[in-house]
């Protein structure tokens, strides 16, 4: 099975790494592609973007980086289309993840919020 996991924060990286370990224990042939951090990368799979590139806090910082944020959404959608996962698992990071989930649902891709 092919899994696409999106964790945009350090806490999501921790939860994502534990989830990936559990997935791989049950399905050693699982293909995992993810947005996360070092902990998830240490488990395996393919890191697309590190959460350090995604973390913008506060209203002003979000506004100043709006072009980057929208660009990341576009990169994510293109990567999902290329990878063609069986399911996408979202870990926190609601501002980004809910946009991707709404789009993916229209395409018939299974969505899971962790």
Model-derived segments and spans:
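Active-site and donor-binding regions of nucleotide-sugar-utilizing enzymes
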Residues: 4-114
